[in-house]
Amino acid sequence: LYLYIVLMVVLINLFIGYYSKEKVAFSVLAYSILRNSTKPVTITPIYLPNIRDDFVRERNNLSSTEFSFSRFMVPHLMNYKGWGLFMDCDQLMLGDIAELWRLRDDKYAVQLCKHDYTPVEDKKFLGQVQTKYEKKNWSSFMLMNCNKCSELTPDYVNSATGLQLHQFKWLESDELIGDLPLEWNWLVDEPGYNTKSKVNNIHFTKGGPWFKEYANCSYSETWNLYHEECSWIER
């Protein structure tokens, strides 16, 4: 008689918004996630040519990136099952993503960092308009309980207004939005966000050090170290 113990390996399903003007940011972020994770991670870029059969929304001048709205396709891409994490590509993971994964709470449809601030500038990277609205940057880092995000069908994501999507009007109540520590989406050089030594995830929301205009922003030295590691080839 043999007793078999089956250990289920839980994969952390992670989606990163891909922006063709910030290719290096995507690569360094993906590397930083893998480097610091103690659990297996699957990383899927939300790259528009890959999802054009379902995501057909036209980009407008208020869409600062190619993934401004396609991020809300994550539940559909997960077949509305399990959990998925969405991240903007202009971030750098310093903590263990497995620690975040342990914070999942099934009573919520989405868990995120509830920022309470208003950007000072009217423009950000590449001269893009800095839009100002309630729940600004909440959707830039979302832990999504996909079976509770069933309203996010391709038809809805393709047709809803930006505010309906980014202010989570597709949920019955804000009570379905769980709170995560701000250190998981630390906004670089924004009001109220000083440079801390202990943060889990840095977000270069104004523009990152891969742009010459932001080469000396806070945490630029940290990003450059990861970039150097990511680019190094052993010979």
Where are these regions (language model features)?
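Short catalytic/ligand-binding loop motif for oxyanion handling, primarily in non-cytosolic enzymes
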Residues: 23-25, 94-96, 101-102, 119-121, ...
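Conserved catalytic core of nucleotide-sugar-dependent glycosyltransferases
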Residues: 104-165
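Active-site-proximal specificity loops/subdomain of glycosyltransferases
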Residues: 42-76
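A glycosyltransferase accessory/donor-loop signature
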Residues: 10-18, 37-39, 45-48, 141-235
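Short, Lys/Arg-enriched N-terminal segments with co-localized hydrophobic residues
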Residues: 1-9
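Short, solvent-exposed loop/edge-beta patches enriched in aromatic
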Residues: 10, 35-40, 77-85
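GT-A fold catalytic core of metal-dependent nucleotide-sugar glycosyltransferases
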Residues: 70-120, 143
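Short, well-formed alpha-helical segments that are part of the catalytic scaffolds
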Residues: 22-34
